[in-house]
Regions:
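Residue-level signal for inorganic ion chemistry
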Residues: 16, 60, 89, 98, ...
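Anionic group-transfer/hydrolysis microenvironments
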Residues: 39, 57, 91, 164, ...
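N-terminal subdomain of lithium-sensitive/metallo-dependent phosphomonoesterases centered on the IMPase/IPPase/PAP
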Residues: 1-57, 215
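An extended, acidic
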Residues: 29, 101, 111-225
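Acidic active-site catalytic centers that drive phospho-/nucleotidyl reactions
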Residues: 16, 55-58, 89, 148, ...
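DPxDG-like acidic metal-binding loop motif
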Residues: 47-101
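General beta-strand structural signal in soluble alpha/beta enzymes
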Residues: 33-38, 54, 63, 140-143, ...
Length: 225
């Protein structure tokens, strides 16, 4: 395993490229389209219009530094939107998955959000540092948004707030986990009102999630300038 820089762009590691090539080999054989962080967009040979949005390694810096919190995240998108999702913690083997309309699961256990409504009682995952106190009881910064959002779906965290400006997350970072959140009863939004579902490789989003609409409203209000 090569955790050194790829030399192609900042923040990309050789491991990212190896994982991407391995994933592309499987997805090409399936005939689906692919939107990958590392290699961009490919039209699927099967002609179904289905696209798998994939981040081969989310949390590459964690992987490079030996922090056991990094994942492969995949989301199948069809004409109706996100249809199926899989997020695998590559350090521990823990798997989160969801199918549209059928619920979300972690290694066979059905997921459900915590139900927290009050921001003052919440434990919230963060990306970056908040510009001001957001009112939560405690916060955690783990460094892999795909897994962080799955913790909200599992009820481990009550919410998630991306504090980085300008928007920095590509759709591959969050889309699989957003479907998992929705199937677990967790609500999500984009800070600036943009659609979280996009197949534009250049688009970036600011993602928030919460166990309940009440908590999400409080977090969005606190996060906005």
């Amino acid at each position: 395993r090569d955790f050194g820089p790829s030399g192609l762009r900042d923040g990309q590691y050789a491991l990212d490229l190896v994982a991407d090539e391995a994933a592309l080999g499987v997805l090409r054989r399936a005939g689906v389209g692919v939107l990958s962080e590392e290699s961009g967009f490919e039209v699927g040979a099967a002609g179904t219009g289905e696209v798998v949005v994939i981040d081969p390694i989310d949390g590459s810096t964690n992987a490079a530094r030996g922090v056991p919190w990094f994942a492969t995240a995949q989301c199948l998108v069809d004409a109706h939107g996100p249809a199926a999702a899989l997020v695998v913690n590559q350090a521990s083997g823990v798997r989160y998955w969801a199918v549209r309309g059928e619920g979300a699961w972690c290694d066979g256990v059905r997921l459900q959000g915590s139900g927290c409504r009050e921001v003052g009682e919440s434990i919230v995952g963060l990306n970056g540092l908040p510009p001001r106190p957001l009112g939560y009881r405690q916060s955690r910064v783990f460094g892999a948004v795909a897994l962080d959002l799955c913790l909200v779906a599992a009820g481990v965290l009550d919410g998630y707030v991306d504090c980085v400006d300008p928007p920095a997350h590509g759709v591959w970072d969050y889309l699989a986990s957003v479907l998992i959140c929705h199937e677990a009863g967790v609500v999500t939004t984009e800070l600036h009102g943009d659609d979280l579902v996009t197949l534009d490789h250049t688009s970036r989003r600011t993602v928030l999630a919460a166990a309940t609409p009440e908590l999400l409203e409080s977090l969005v209000a606190a996060r906005r300038p």
